[in-house]
Regions:
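Core subunits and conserved enzymes of cellular information-processing
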Residues: 240, 244, 248-250, 320, ...
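N-terminal catalytic cores of NTP/NDP-binding nucleotidyl/phosphoryl-transfer enzymes
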Residues: 11-90, 206-237
Length: 587
C-alpha cells in the first residue's frame, strides 16, 4: 500500500472512531454494558513503539470507561518463545504507566481448544489433511479462481479423531498431518478456504512442557481466547481486516459448542482494526530486529538506536512523551508513515518540563581568567529546572580555570559571531561576564589548534548582583570548572538507517539482489548512527545522577545516564537535541 508521510498531525478529533464505538456499545448495553479488553503480545521478542500504540488504547480506554484490560501472552509457537521476553513485556507495560487486571496465556486454553477441535471433527467441520504444505497452498486457488477440495476432506469422523490424537502423540512428524476447518474452498475470502487450525511441532512448551505436540494456529486461538476470557472489544491492526469474518465464525462455532445460542450475536468479542504506528527511518519487524541483535549490528535489544520500548527508555525517552505522541497521531483506518520529527517533538516538549539543567562540555577547550585570584573557589547557585520551581537548585563551583566548548571560541571572528573572540564579551551561565583578551587571546599547539584561551572577568557582574544586568552583545555560554570537572563519555545517536523507508527498501534490495535480510540491512545501516565522545567534562551534580534521570545539557540537548554508567566513569546517552534535527515541523 502507498503510504503518505505525515509531517504534522491534523487537528485531533475529540474521540477516535474506536472510542466512539466503545461509547455506542456501552450505551446500547452490548455485552451487558461491560468493557473488557486485552493486550495479546507474542513472547518472541521485545516490544517496540508500535506495540505501545496498541497498549495505549487497550489499557487506556479500559481505564477511561471503568473496564478492565488483561495481559494475555499468545504463546502458541514454542519455537520462538522465551521467559526473557515475557519479563521484558511486563516491565515495558509497567514503565509505560499501565497495569493489567489479570495475566493469561493462550496455553491456558489449550485443553479447551483441543476439546473444541474434537467437537468440530465430530460435527463434520474439521478434518485431518496429510498433504504437504506446498500442495495445500496450490489447492487454495486464487482470488479470481476457486480452490480444489483436498482428497481427505471427506475422511470419516472416526478416522479423523484417531489421526488427530496421533498428531499429539509425539510420534507424528511435523508437516505430515494438519487439522483443517471445513468451510468453503470457493469462498471469495481466501482465509475461509479450509484454513489450518492445528499443526504438529513436537517441541516442549515453556509452560506446558511435553503435554502438547500439536499446537493451535493463531486464527484458531485468538478469537476463542478472547471469548473464553470475556473480552468485549478486540483491537488489532489493519492486516487483520480480512481475518475478522473468520474470527467471528470461530466464535460463533464456539458459542454453539458451549450451548450459548440464545443470543448468538451478543455476549461475544468484537474485533476492530486500526492503523499501525509506522515511523520513517525505522524498521519495526521483530524478525528483522532479532536479526540485528543476533548479527551484533546493534548492541542488544535495548540499544538506544532500536525502536524497542526498552531502547527508547535507555535513550532517555519518558513514557509520557511516547503516550503523548501516540495520542497526537491518533487511530485511523489508513496506514501512514509518520515523521520521526513528530516523535522527537513530543519528547522535547515533555522533557522540557521535567529535565534537570546541568552543564556539560563535549568538545572542551580551557579558559583561564587572568584576573581571578589563583586558588579561589566560589559556590554559585544554579536553578535545576526553570519550568518547575519545586525541583530546587544546586551549587556549581567557579574557579580561575574553566572548560568551555571549542566551538564557542573563534580567534578570527566577524561581527556576526556572538560568542567568545578577541575583545568580545560573553556571559557565563549562573556566573560572570568575561572578556577575551585582545592581545595574546590564546595559545595554540604546533598544528594551530587552540589549547588555552585567556580572558578577564567582571567581578561586579555575578548573577544576582546589580552588575549582572549590564547589557552585552555576546551570548550566554555554558561552562564547567576545571577544578572539579568530572570526565565522562557521551554517546551521540543518529538514525540507524540511511533510507527513509527501510521496510520497503529492504524488500526491494532482497528482490533485486536475491539476498537475505541481513545482507540487505548491512547496506542500509547508517555508519554514523553512533558517535562516542570520551573526553567530555561534566559538573559533579550531573555525574551523581542515576540511569533514567532526565537531564538537559544546557545549549546542547537532552541526555540521560546510561546503564553502563559508573561513579568512576559516567556515561551519558543523548536523547534528543534542543532543536529538530529530522525535519521542519510547521506549527
Amino acid at each position: 500500500m502507498e503510504e503518505n508521510i505525515i509531517h504534522e498531525s491534523e487537528e485531533k478529533k475529540s474521540v477516535s472512531f474506536i472510542e466512539q464505538k466503545v461509547i455506542n456499545d456501552l450505551a446500547e448495553g452490548k455485552n451487558g454494558g461491560r468493557l473488557q479488553t486485552r493486550f495479546p503480545p507474542e513472547p518472541n521478542g521485545y516490544l517496540h513503539i508500535g506495540h505501545a500504540k496498541a497498549i495505549a488504547i487497550d489499557f487506556g480506554l479500559a481505564k477511561k470507561y471503568n473496564g478492565t484490560c488483561n495481559l494475555r501472552f499468545d504463546d502458541t509457537n514454542p519455537i520462538k518463545e522465551d521467559t526473557e521476553y515475557i519479563e521484558s513485556i511486563e516491565n515495558d507495560i509497567k514503565w509505560l504507566g499501565f497495569q493489567w487486571a489479570n495475566v493469561y496465556y493462550a496455553s491456558d486454553y489449550f485443553q479447551e481448544l483441543w476439546d473444541f477441535a474434537v467437537w468440530l471433527i465430530k460435527q463434520g467441520r474439521a478434518y485431518v489433511d496429510e498433504q504437504s504444505s506446498e500442495v495445500i497452498a496450490q489447492q487454495k486457488g486464487t482470488t479470481t479462481s476457486p480452490g480444489t477440495n483436498s482428497p481427505f476432506r471427506d475422511r470419516p469422523v472416526e478416522e479423523n479423531l484417531k489421526l488427530f490424537e496421533f498428531m499429539n502423540s509425539g510420534k507424528c512428524e511435523p508437516g505430515t498431518l494438519v487439522l483443517r476447518a471445513k468451510i468453503d474452498m470457493a469462498h471469495p475470502n481466501m482465509l475461509f478456504r479450509d484454513p489450518l487450525i492445528y499443526r504438529v511441532l513436537n517441541i516442549p512448551h515453556i509452560r506446558t512442557g511435553n503435554k502438547w505436540n500439536a499446537y493451535p494456529m493463531y486464527d484458531f486461538t485468538h478469537g476463542q481466547s478472547d471469548y473464553l476470557e470475556g473480552v468485549t472489544h478486540s483491537w488489532c491492526t489493519l492486516e487483520f481486516v480480512e481475518h475478522r469474518p473468520l474470527y467471528d465464525l470461530f466464535v460463533t462455532w464456539m458459542k454453539e459448542w458451549k450451548g450459548e445460542t440464545d443470543n448468538i450475536e451478543d455476549n461475544r468479542p468484537r474485533q476492530t482494526e486500526f492503523n499501525k504506528l509506522n515511523l520513517n527511518y525505522t524498521l519495526m519487524s521483530k524478525r528483522n530486529l532479532l536479526a540485528l541483535v543476533n548479527e551484533k549490528l546493534v548492541n542488544g535489544w535495548d540499544d538506544p538506536r532500536m525502536p524497542t520500548i526498552c531502547g527508547f527508555r535507555r535513550r532517555g525517552y519518558s513514557p509520557e512523551s511516547i503516550i503523548k505522541f501516540i495520542d497526537k497521531i491518533g487511530y485511523t483506518k489508513i496506514d501512514a508513515l509518520n515523521d520521526m520529527a513528530l516523535l522527537e517533538s513530543a519528547v522535547r516538549d515533555d522533557l522540557n518540563s521535567r529535565a534537570l539543567r546541568v552543564s556539560a562540555v563535549l568538545n572542551p577547550v580551557k579558559v583561564v581568567l587572568t584576573n581571578y585570584p589563583e586558588g579561589q573557589l566560589e559556590q554559585l547557585t544554579a536553578v535545576n529546572n526553570p519550568e518547575n520551581e519545586a525541583d530546587g537548585t544546586h551549587e556549581v563551583e567557579f574557579s580561575r580555570e574553566l572548560w568551555i566548548e571549542r566551538d564557542d571560541f573563534m580567534k578570527e571572528a566577524d561581527k556576526k559571531f556572538m560568542r567568545l573572540a578577541p575583545g568580545k564579551e560573553v556571559r557565563l551561565k549562573n556566573a560572570y561576564i568575561i572578556k577575551c583578551n585582545e592581545e595574546h587571546p590564546c595559545d595554540e599547539d604546533e598544528n594551530g589548534n587552540v589549547t588555552t584561551i585567556y580572558c578577564t572577568y567582571d567581578p561586579e557582574s555575578r548573577s544576582g548582583l546589580p552588575g549582572s544586568n549590564r547589557k552585552i552583545k555576546g551570548k550566554t555560554l555554558h561552562w564547567v570548572s576545571c577544578h572539579n570537572a568530572v570526565k565522562a563519555e557521551v554517546r551521540l545517536y543518529d538514525r540507524l538507517w540511511k533510507v527513509e523507508n527501510p521496510r520497503d527498501t529492504l524488500a526491494d534490495l532482497r528482490e533485486e539482489q536475491n539476498c537475505d535480510a541481513v545482507t540487505a540491512m548491512k547496506q542500509m545501516i547508517n555508519p554514523n548512527s553512533l558517535s562516542i565522545l570520551k573526553d567530555c567534562f561534566i559538573e559533579p551534580f550531573a555525574a551523581s545522577m542515576k540511569p533514567l534521570t532526565y537531564l538537559q545539557f544546557q545549549r546542547i540537548g537532552y541526555f540521560t545516564p546510561d546503564s553502563d554508567s559508573t561513579a568512576e566513569k559516567p556515561v551519558f546517552n543523548k536523547t534528543v537535541g534542543l532543536k529538530d534535527t529530522w525535519a521542519k515541523i510547521n506549527k
